[in-house]
Regions:
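Bacterial N-terminal signal peptides that target proteins for export
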Residues: 1-8
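Intrinsically disordered, low-complexity proline-rich regions
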Residues: 4, 20-23
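Flanking scaffold residues of small Cys/His-coordinated metal-binding clusters
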Residues: 11
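C-terminal motif of bacterial Sec signal peptides marking the signal peptidase cleavage site
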Residues: 15-18
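Beta-strand-enriched cores of mature, soluble protein domains
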Residues: 22-176
């Protein structure tokens, strides 16, 4: 009996001591205390960066507008981190005299979510297959890309005879 009473008496003494103390300020772990654990904030809602890296292959249609300006439309497909398999359209305007262009990327994921970006780029036209470097700023999207931001670089090769392009993309998407 004595071994049973000792823990009960110790627990009662501990409880009485805890209850006799005056209330303290809420801790950061208390509900509603403004801490992050229980304050209603969610890590899923906090902006976070994800890597964006992939490859693309496609066809190119070039239409003269008012030389040296040409409308160029790329229709491509590929695969990238976080996006998965995608289709891609890239309408843009190119000044063939300066080898500079500007336009938009629209990636469509397999589930229909879209990621959009605006870019500027330059081409090295000194060889039969042009080397093109583009820098893009992500402007948003739909589905899981709604409100997305970030940036990426595209490095492509364009064969003007075959009217094809291949390339890589690499950067980050900031999910909001």
């Amino acid at each position: 009996m004595r071994s049973f009473l000792a823990p009960v008496v110790a627990a009662a003494a501990l409880l009485a001591a805890a209850c006799s103390q005056s209330p303290s300020a809420p801790s950061s772990l208390s509900p509603g205390a403004g801490g992050t654990l229980f304050s209603g904030a969610s890590d899923a809602q906090a902006p976070h960066e994800v890597p964006f890296k992939g490859r693309l292959d496609g066809t190119v249609v070039v239409t003269p507008v008012n030389p040296p300006f040409f409308n160029v439309v790329i229709t491509a497909s590929g695969e990238a981190t976080y996006l998965g398999r995608f289709s891609l359209t890239v309408p843009h305007l190119v000044n063939f005299a300066t080898a500079e262009g500007e336009g938009d990327f629209t990636f469509t994921a397999a589930n229909g979510d879209m990621l959009t970006a605006h870019f500027t780029g330059t081409a090295d036209t000194s060889t039969p297959v042009f080397a093109i470097d583009e820098h893009a700023t992500i402007t948003g999207g739909t589905g899981r890309f709604a409100g997305a931001s970030g940036s990426f670089d595209a490095h492509r090769h364009y064969d003007p005879v075959a009217q094809t392009t291949t390339g890589t993309i690499e950067g980050t998407i900031v999910m909001h």
